């Protein structure tokens, strides 16, 4: 029973979190091991269109159709989505690394964008998939907010998505490209 006092020392009173601090650099490294698609979140407020590269995006519910985006509280996009009450999610195609870099704060000289509006929300015309969502709820999540959006509009083409893994862009390879690998149905 000697381990019980040591275990108690590791946890803060009233918390399930270990008392030690998590190194933010290491946290980012570990989280980057999860391969994910790259999106540009768009919104318009007071006549100004904003876009921000993000990979904190997920489907939230099928019934009703909801999606979730994670936005840093200090980001200009946080204020823009809050004011607009809606947002666009633009899933980038595998060839759109330059678009990702541009909206991540590394502008690409000469890069031009065409926006289309659906349900009052700007979307990148050349994204491989686009969603418009009306903000249904906002939840605090540490230094971020989770915006839950009710899907109003969605469209997609057949191009493969841009993927990021270990802080690098990656290519998508389908499992059924390997002989004998069965298809997987999640829905």
Give residue spans per PLM region.
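Basic, polyanion-binding surface patches
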Residues: 2-187
């Amino acid at each position: 029973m000697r381990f019980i006092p040591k275990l108690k020392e590791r946890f803060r009173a009233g918390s399930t979190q270990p008392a030690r601090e998590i190194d933010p650099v290491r946290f980012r490294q570990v989280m980057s091991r999860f391969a994910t698609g790259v999106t540009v979140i768009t919104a318009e407020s007071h006549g100004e269109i904003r876009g921000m590269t993000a990979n904190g995006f997920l489907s939230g519910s099928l019934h009703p159709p909801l999606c979730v985006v994670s936005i840093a509280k200090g980001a200009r996009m946080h204020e823009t989505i809050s004011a607009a009450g809606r947002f666009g999610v633009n899933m980038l195609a595998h060839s759109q690394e330059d678009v990702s870099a541009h909206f991540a704060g590394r502008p690409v000289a000469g890069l031009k964008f065409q926006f289309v509006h659906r349900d009052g929300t700007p979307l990148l015309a050349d994204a491989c998939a686009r969603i418009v969502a009306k903000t249904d709820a906002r939840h605090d999540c540490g230094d971020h907010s989770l915006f839950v959006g009710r899907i109003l509009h969605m469209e997609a083409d057949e191009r493969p998505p841009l993927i990021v893994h270990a802080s690098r862009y990656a290519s998508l390879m389908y499992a059924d490209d390997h002989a004998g690998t069965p298809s997987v149905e999640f829905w």
